Regions:
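Extracytoplasmic catalytic/substrate-binding loops of multi-pass membrane glycan-assembly enzymes
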Residues: 29-41, 51-63, 78, 319-321, ...
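Start-transfer (signal-anchor) and selected internal transmembrane alpha helices
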Residues: 1-24, 90, 113-127, 266-300, ...
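ER/secretory pathway lumenal C-terminal domains and tails of membrane proteins involved
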Residues: 80, 85, 100-108, 139, ...
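Short hydrophobic/aromatic helix or loop-helix immediately within or flanking a transmembrane segment
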Residues: 44-47, 52-78, 82-86, 93, ...
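Alpha-helical transmembrane segments
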Residues: 11-24, 126-132, 181, 224-231, ...
Length: 937
């Protein structure tokens, strides 16, 4: 077969694999948003909003294009998920072409005629490797939801195929165009995910092997070192450096020359592009000219971040971190809101802050960083609000892996440490190999190519989330008799067994590649560095702590992609070995067919736990939180984590559910940008009742205030001796929340910047309470008129005993509670953990998936039954559960429910149980039976 005919067959087979993958992923996509970050990404794509740092502007732009095809708001998420399905199929397409190109170059010289056996081996190896990756656990999971990892995988596959394609034209005048295009794609990939940068070592190695006549180990090491330097320069110099220099220009043009905001940044970008273009025309030497072209195209791709800056200035409903100027954008890009882990040297969990003398005292030594600028729109200038500071620690360690002081006991359980002191280097390395490498990488790797025990997140226990082969002898030796596990685990849909066949085929592929002489060794090094950089190198960089909130296998999809190349090579190696024994074409074809059965077997195992069709749980459960709220009064609901916030945002932003309500994420409520956004109206709801000025909630101001109960007696004495003066200074009631905040906590006077009591109060507007529809305690529900009004307490009292400080979030919650005046309903999602030491639960009444703040201490009034600390409004709960809530298609036979979905199902199931129990307690057995029957459905 000549080259042109083979090329047609290769193209046809590649597109066939693309169609297979697109069909599989299209059939199994989730028809709406999935849990974790997906609802946020979909909302950001639909309205070009600003998501969490460091953002994904290019993904947003492409996603926004696809959302234009949605027939109505409920279909927006389906279009974004379908985009991911197509991108994932595109990744499979380029994987196929990469495998066939690599295998062909090992079998024949370029453009040499091929035998039928050669064609079977080449195309068959591409099919085996590509389909094995198609049906692998991690990649399929990302392919059917609206996250960035499918796009990142597509770009990884694209640039790897491009550098292989460049080899065909490397010696022509057109060859450099492929290198320049790769630079552009890498620039665009910065606007999707930084994982794509990790392809650079493989790209540089291909370039080295192709362009240099004399290949040596020293040269290969130099190429790898150069590629590592390129990654460091792009990641730690180019990306933040562009923002740094843009900031210098901005300060010059705005603060010194008096131009409007953003002028300096625009001038800097104009100068940058001018210099690059001028350099391209000035320097014609091929190496310099190509380098300038690559820098230009990298910069053009990187400028997708202008979308973040533009949309942040538009103050979109989702505008996380509000990066509306170059200084905020730099912080956004650097992910400064997240805790950073040491890489090569740093503290351990036992490290203590370093102290330095200051006068008669010692203070914590701080490392001072750069200034933090904020735009002052009244003055038209940037102002320094503070300098960045970092605590200096003693007892630092080389290659510190056990660094988080909140995880000391978990570190010890993984490292074998028992003495409670600082970790030794042996324990440090034990933790690194046992947890970070073995448990958080190799376990995921083996999930994909050996088998998976179940889809329950594991934390080291033998019954959850381990890898298994499906061969009882091997599995029982490692994990105990698997037949003794509960049926729920044995029948778990995430139980996938591949009998280690994909792994064995991949190992054969590595061996075959290694044995193919010089060219094979070169290929092996290229694929190995793609495998290493997108897998083990990420493990080194992330430095993860134990107890991750979810499994992290999605971060290593690129590494599994590289191993899929070796799986394809393994099929080629087996067939090539059979051919050398002078077997017929039929025998080789039959063996390749048997190899193809491996991905078929993988599909038979993984289909049931990757088919998300007909599953609407994330959308409906998010809507249920909002539907818990009353229809009037512009209610407010406090949320906290990803899965009790992002689905709510998605419902409100994208599908228009309950735009009269406000969602307040308490994990953001300590930040100045979020407080400002919450003060502003949104859709049909007014801002939150927060009266603080920008100066009062600015970053670094009023982060916490000390509680000084010993001052209470002095204040009471002042009110006794000088009542008029006291009232003028501290209000009529000095311990009422509004007065505490006004005269004490937010005071500019340092001596008054305290909470002078351990018991604070909030006044109760009794008429407002009666109008609000809040459930009244049983003991006063029968009263009427003035008797009822008089029975309502005048104040509620909140104890601060055993507390040393109030945080900014605490103070904001107290102010909102006081300012809502029982007219604007205030709720706390039931999934919110302990975000505050304030004890409100006695004042809670449960109406569904949220607790309502009330002025009644139901425990004292006798409404709290059993072990609960809160009351239950049976009528509202019944209405919500039976009539207002939707349940995401849970009644669909065979619907796949993963662990995250099941966890949210448990919240709903608990509601049914609580409601039935309360109805039975009230003697309403008829409705209790209806509730239980509905739950069973």
């Amino acid at each position: 077969m000549n080259y042109l005919l083979f090329k047609r067959w290769n193209d046809f087979s590649g597109w066939l694999v693309f169609l297979i993958a697109a069909f599989v992923y299209g059939m199994t996509i989730e028809p709406t948003a999935s849990f974790w970050d997906c609802p946020e990404f979909i909302s950001c794509a639909e309205k070009l909003q600003v998501g969490h740092p460091p953002g994904a502007p290019f993904y947003m732009l492409v996603g926004n294009l696809f959302t234009q095809f949605a027939s109505d708001p409920s279909q927006v998420s389906r279009t974004v998920n379908f985009l991911n399905a197509l991108l994932s199929a595109g990744c499979i397409l380029f994987l196929f072409w990469s495998i066939t190109r690599l295998v062909r170059s090992l079998l024949k010289e370029e453009k040499e005629n091929l035998s039928v056996t050669d064609v079977i081996i080449i195309l068959g190896s591409g099919l085996v490797g590509a389909l094995a990756y198609t049906f692998s656990d991690t990649f399929w999971f990302s392919a059917v939801e609206g996250e960035v990892y499918a796009f990142s995988s597509f770009l990884t596959a694209l640039v790897f195929w491009m550098i292989l394609r460049w080899q065909d034209e490397s010696d022509t005048v057109y060859g450099d165009r492929w290198i320049i295009l790769i630079a552009y794609i890498i620039g665009l990939s910065i606007g999707v995910h930084l994982l794509n940068l990790l392809c650079i070592p493989a790209i540089v190695l291909v370039f080295y092997y192709q362009k240099y006549q004399t290949i040596s180990l020293k040269g290969a090491i130099a190429a790898i070192a150069l590629s590592g330097l390129l990654i460091v320069l792009i990641l730690f110099v180019y990306i933040p450096g562009m923002a740094d220099i843009g900031g210098w220009f901005e300060l010059l043009f705005v603060n010194v020359l008096g131009f409007p905001f953003q002028t300096g940044l625009i001038v800097f970008l104009a100068i940058t592009f001018f210099l690059l273009i001028a350099g391209i025309y000035r320097f014609k030497k091929r190496l310099i000219n190509t380098a300038l072209w690559c820098t230009l195209m990298l910069t053009v791709g990187y400028t997708t971040y202008a979308v973040i800056l533009i949309r942040a200035n538009a103050n979109t409903p989702l505008n996380e971190n509000a990066p509306d100027n170059i200084f905020a954008l730099k912080s956004y890009l650097n992910r400064e809101q997240y805790e950073s882990a040491p890489l090569l040297y740093g503290k351990t969990y036992a490290s203590e802050p370093e102290y330095v003398p200051e006068g008669d005292y010692y203070k914590v030594k701080m490392k001072t960083g750069g200034a933090v600028y904020r735009p002052n729109k009244e003055e038209g200038k940037y102002k320094v609000i503070r300098n960045k500071e970092e605590v200096c620690y003693t007892q630092n360690m080389l290659f510190s892996r056990m660094w988080n002081d909140r995880m000391a006991s978990s570190y010890k359980s993984w490292s074998g440490g028992t003495d409670g002191g600082a970790p030794t280097q042996k324990e440090n390395l034990t933790y690194f190999f046992t947890y970070q490498l073995n448990y958080m990488y190799w376990r995921y790797f083996l999930w994909n190519f050996v088998g998976r025990q179940n889809d329950i997140q594991g934390h080291g226990e033998p019954e959850h989330g381990n890898w298994i082969t499906g061969i009882p002898l091997l599995d029982n030796l490692r994990l105990g008799d698997q037949e003794l596990l509960p049926e729920s685990l044995r029948q778990n849909k995430g139980h996938n067994v591949f009998y280690a066949l994909p792994l064995l085929l991949g190992l054969i592929g590595i061996y075959w590649q290694w044995m193919r002489g010089k060219k094979g060794m070169q290929q092996l090094s290229v694929v190995f560095f793609l495998f290493f950089m997108t897998g083990l190198a990420i493990v080194l960089y992330l430095n993860q702590t134990p107890g991750q909130p979810r499994e992290r296998d999605y971060a290593y999809a690129g590494s599994f992609y590289a191993f899929a190349i070796w799986i394809g090579m393994g099929a080629a190696g087996l067939c090539d070995a059979l051919r050398k024994k002078k077997s017929s074409v039929l025998h080789v074809g039959l063996l390749m067919f048997l190899c193809l059965l491996i991905p078929v077997q993988m599909a038979s195992q993984t289909w049931d736990d990757h088919d998300r069709s007909n599953r609407f749980t994330c959308r409906d459960f998010g809507a249920n939180y909002l539907m818990t709220l009353p229809d009037k009064g512009n209610p407010i609901i406090f949320s906290n984590g990803d899965n009790d916030t992002f689905p709510l945002w998605y419902n409100q932003d994208t599908e228009g559910v309950r735009r009269d309500a406000r969602i307040c994420n308490l994990s953001y409520a300590q930040t100045d940008w979020y407080i400002y956004q919450q003060q502003c109206p949104l859709y049909d709801a007014p801002g939150l009742p927060i009266t603080w000025s920008k100066d009062q909630y600015q970053e670094g101001k009023n982060e916490y205030v000390a509680i000084r109960p010993e001052l209470k007696k002095q204040i009471e004495e002042l009110y006794q001796k000088h009542p008029e003066e006291a009232r003028d200074s501290f209000g009529n009631d000095p311990f009422e929340v509004k007065n505490i905040l006004k005269y004490w906590a937010l005071s500019e006077k340092q001596d008054f910047h305290v909470i002078p009591t351990d018991t604070i109060s909030i006044s109760i507007d009794k008429d407002a309470v009666l109008r609000s529809g809040i459930m009244l305690p049983d003991s006063i529900r029968h009263l009427k008129g003035e008797d009822l009004k008089n029975a309502i307490p005048d104040k509620i009292y909140i104890s601060l005993k055993d507390m040393r400080i109030l945080t900014k979030v605490d103070m904001l919650m107290l102010e909102m509670l006081a300012n809502c005046n029982w007219e604007r309903p205030l709720y706390m999602a039931i999934s919110v953990g302990e975000v505050s030491k304030l004890k409100f639960d006695h004042y809670f009444v449960q109406e569904g998936l949220a607790f309502r703040f009330t002025p009644f201490d139901y425990k004292k009034w006798g409404n709290v039954k059993g072990d609960n600390n809160y009351a239950i409004d049976v009528e509202r709960l019944y209405e919500n559960v039976m009539n207002r809530y939707k349940y995401g298609g849970l009644d669909t036979p065979g619907l796949y429910l993963d662990e995250t979905t099941l966890r949210t199902c448990y919240y709903h199931r608990r509601l049914f149980a609580q409601l039935a129990k309360e109805l039975i307690r009230q003697g309403d057995n008829t409705r209790a039976r209806k509730v239980l029957a509905y739950a069973e459905q």
